[in-house]
């Protein structure tokens, strides 16, 4: 007799829901409306972003697309550089050895408690950090790690806060504020008064508000309670002295001062500064990771864990773009290994599509990605899978299967393989139909889907609602 209201992006939960409320149409200021209210079956027919993905009109990754810029899987060849980890036995890991191909998207999969985080966070990451002379805790028990010389660095991109100061914001994090300060320094009034770009810094210099030091807030320590940030009473949160705010630049039909620019969302800024190449180049990585709804001056401590993780990714994209532009080489001689722990948590289908495009940018210039992931769109699009299990806890810690997604999909005892097969049926993905054409006819798909769901248990969907939707999809 209870009622459940769930914020969810997993299609299995959506299919099982009795009622769907779809918010949008866009993120941030472009959202805040109910764009659909009804059943999941009706949502699939509705022309909303969520409906487009649930119905298959849009796909997070179209593996068969030949369009320029489309995701492409990278084959693992015999000469592909690899990391070799031998004898990992930390916590429940059962003396496992594995090869990890580099310059590829590698997903570590498996049920909860199967040893994924232990493998990445307790063994692999500390061992690599120690190899590069970085401060880290002692690596978990293992025999040896080989192949790290193929890399120039390793970065673990987690959801921890980027910083604790309110002065740090998305614009400064990716280097866009430097370019914007240069624009203000060229304004007629700034040149008349002799203001340089440094005058428009909120981190240093005498142009910032002397009361709050350029943060726009006063920090009040509450001892045993969470600290409180109060809007600065002198600058009213605008960060700068009044005379600095008199300097304006004209963009489109707006005359903007520095405080006005910091209040722009990234989406608004890319439109207003479309003709300013340096600003646009610096902001583009934030757009690429799907954070164009945040404000340029939003303090980074106020970002969620997922937003902080994506902003870190945007920072690496910006850094990679600058390095590539300076060296004029499209491919890094020794790439960086990026480690992610469930980066799709809390993301919509469309956000995941943007995230995958950002991943592709890193791969295209020679970097490597290892991702702990449960999202089936990401798993099926990866270049290599390492499936842990078979169960959790003491019944896990083994490598059930490793290889391409197609290899794992066909593995008889892999929960991930079973989930991939089930997902292909539910979403009407061609790969399942192609591998079953000779032994399954179209009228038997609903029966096949029912059998898969019975066998999977908690691996994918267990309610009757997805089954009814599957039948409606495949029965005449």
Q: Where are the regions a protein language model picked out?
A:
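Arg/Gly-rich low-complexity intrinsically disordered repeat tracts
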Residues: 440-460, 468-471
């Amino acid at each position: 007799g209870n009622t459940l209201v769930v914020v969810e992006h997993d299609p299995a939960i959506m299919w099982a829901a009795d009622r769907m409320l779809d918010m949008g149409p866009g993120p941030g200021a472009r959202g805040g409306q109910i764009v659909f209210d009804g059943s999941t079956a009706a949502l699939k027919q509705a022309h909303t972003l969520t409906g487009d993905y649930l119905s298959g009109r849009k796909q997070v990754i179209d593996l068969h697309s030949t369009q320029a810029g489309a995701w492409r899987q990278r084959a693992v060849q015999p000469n592909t550089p690899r990391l070799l980890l031998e004898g990992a036995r930390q916590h429940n890991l059962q003396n496992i050895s594995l090869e990890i191909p580099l310059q590829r998207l590698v997903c570590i999969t498996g049920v909860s408690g199967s040893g994924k985080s232990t493998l990445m966070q307790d063994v692999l990451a500390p061992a690599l950090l120690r190899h590069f002379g970085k401060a880290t805790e002692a690596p978990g028990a293992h025999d040896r790690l080989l192949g790290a010389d193929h890399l120039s660095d390793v970065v673990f991109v987690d959801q921890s806060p980027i910083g604790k100061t309110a002065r740090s914001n998305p614009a400064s994090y990716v280097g866009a504020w430097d370019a914007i300060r240069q624009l203000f320094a060229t304004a007629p009034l700034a040149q008349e008064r002799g203001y340089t770009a440094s005058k428009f810094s909120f981190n240093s210099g005498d142009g910032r508000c002397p009361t709050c030091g350029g943060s726009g807030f006063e920090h009040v320590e509450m001892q045993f309670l969470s600290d409180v940030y109060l809007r600065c009473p002198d600058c009213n949160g605008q960060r700068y002295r009044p005379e600095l705010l008199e300097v304006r630049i004209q963009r489109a039909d707006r005359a903007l001062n520095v405080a006005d620019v910091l209040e722009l969302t990234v989406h608004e800024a890319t439109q207003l500064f479309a003709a300013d190449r340096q600003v646009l180049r610096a902001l583009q990585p934030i757009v690429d990771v799907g954070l164009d709804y945040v404000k340029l001056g939003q303090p980074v401590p106020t970002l969620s864990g997922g937003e902080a993780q994506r902003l870190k990714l945007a920072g690496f994209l910006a850094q990679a773009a600058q390095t590539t532009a300076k060296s004029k080489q499209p491919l890094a001689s020794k790439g960086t290994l990026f480690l992610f722990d469930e980066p799709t948590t809390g993301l919509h289908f469309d956000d995941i599509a943007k995230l995958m495009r950002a991943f592709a940018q890193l791969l295209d210039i020679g970097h490597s990605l290892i991702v702990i992931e449960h999202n089936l769109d990401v798993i099926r699009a990866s270049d290599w899978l390492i499936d842990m299990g078979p169960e959790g806890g003491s019944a896990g810690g083994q490598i059930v299967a490793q290889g391409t997604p197609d290899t794992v999909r066909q593995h008889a005892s892999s929960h991930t393989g079973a989930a991939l097969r089930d997902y292909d049926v539910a979403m009407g993905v061609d790969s399942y139909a192609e591998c079953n054409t000779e032994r399954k006819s179209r009228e038997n798909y609903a029966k096949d889907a029912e059998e898969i769901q019975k066998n999977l248990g908690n691996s994918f969907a267990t309610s009757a609602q997805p089954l009814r939707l599957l039948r409606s999809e495949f029965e005449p």
